[in-house]
A protein has these predicted regions:
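Fe-S-dependent hydro-lyases/dehydratases of central metabolism
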Residues: 1-337
Length: 337
């Protein structure tokens, strides 16, 4: 990811374009293929698509690819008009867009991270909507995408430079730091290097629930001092364990290698794991046939990740999975006390 993003002031690039996802799908086609450029001042929010689903942005078959640049080739492959794709392969990436605009509740549906990736790796860095689905908003934050509203877009299209702080002021202090440093991976790398100082937790001594005590005991940056947390505090806590599965492990492997180098390592590998449970029965299913090679690549890269990191291996044995990741993690990963 670019070390210079985001800048202190957000300004539109005169050589880039703004794509409006309108309810009139022909207008989208005209922007993609006929050079039509629109302005927010000539439209209303009611003209824009609401409830854009993450399955529309990256249908399940697109997720058989794991490299974001390849995923971007099929951005919005699920948006159909009379049975035909509105976005042909490469249409978003080839359109020269840096801003994408929609209506209410952008990113409903599944939580898949590939949805904002398809925009980010198509050149989109500014995402405009009246509102965002919460998980989709967080996934955009983790990629360092700048999100704003339609009034901000009107100002940008009129030539104004808007301070980054106006885009981030709605968030808590930790989230602002993540955005201001380009997303979760560059933020985490700088935090580990001591280049970022987390805001102090100001909660005074108080009675806490068990969950609050666990979070307080795992706060990053407390340096052994007794800390207290309360609802609403923005904090970062160390995670003792985690897992991934075939649909996500390849991306984890690639992102960590890109950010930390090919020799990256995980802390406490025995508390992390990979599961073979999502694509276990994909082999031999006719509708998965066209994606058989990609599915096998996902499996192979999960094996490579496990061998590289030394995390727990919950691969299938003789075609039988050890269990569903969500359930096994609850049963086997938690240490009492």
């Amino acid at each position: 990811m670019s070390a210079s993003w985001p800048p202190e002031f957000i300004t539109l690039n005169p050589n880039k374009r703004v794509l409006f996802l309108t309810k009139d799908l022909q207008l989208i086609k005209d922007q993609l293929y006929n050079g039509l450029n629109l302005n927010m001042c000539d439209l209303s929010v009611d003209d824009l698509l609401d409830d854009i689903n993450t399955d529309v942005m990256t249908p399940a078959w697109v997720c058989f690819d794991h490299e974001p640049a390849v995923i971007a080739e099929n951005a919005y492959a699920g948006l159909l008009h009379e049975g035909e794709r509105v976005f042909n392969s490469g249409a978003l990436k080839d359109g020269g867009f840096e801003v994408i605009v929609s209506g209410h509740r952008k990113g409903t549906g599944s939580s898949r991270e590939t949805a904002p990736q398809c925009e980010r790796w198509s050149g989109i860095r500014i995402v405009i909507a009246a509102s965002f689905a919460p998980i989709h908003e967080r996934n955009n934050i983790n990629l360092g995408q700048v999100m704003g509203d339609h009034q901000m877009l009107e100002r940008l299209q009129s030539g104004e430079s808007i301070p980054l702080a106006e885009f981030t002021e709605q968030y808590d202090p930790v989230t602002r730091l993540i955005l201001e440093n380009g997303g979760i991976l560059p933020f985490a790398k700088k935090l580990k290097a001591g280049e970022i100082e987390l805001p102090a937790v100001s909660t005074e001594r108080r009675g806490m629930t068990m969950a609050e005590k666990i979070v307080a005991n795992k706060l990053i940056g407390r340096n052994g001092a007794a800390c207290y947390v309360s609802p609403g505090d923005a904090v970062l806590a160390s995670v003792d364990g985690g897992y991934s599965h075939e649909f996500t492990t390849a991306q984890v492997h690639n992102f960590l290698a890109a950010e930390y180098g090919e020799d990256y390592a995980l802390p406490n590998p025995p508390k992390f794991a990979v599961f073979e449970d999502h694509l276990l029965y994909a082999t031999g299913v006719p509708r998965f046939g066209p994606f058989a090679d990609k599915i096998q690549t996902l499996r192979d890269l999960q094996v490579a990740f496990q061998q590289h990191t030394g995390v727990r291996d919950y691969s299938a044995k003789d075609g039988v999975s050890p269990g569903i990741c969500h359930q096994v993690a609850r049963e086997e990963f938690i240490d009492v006390g």
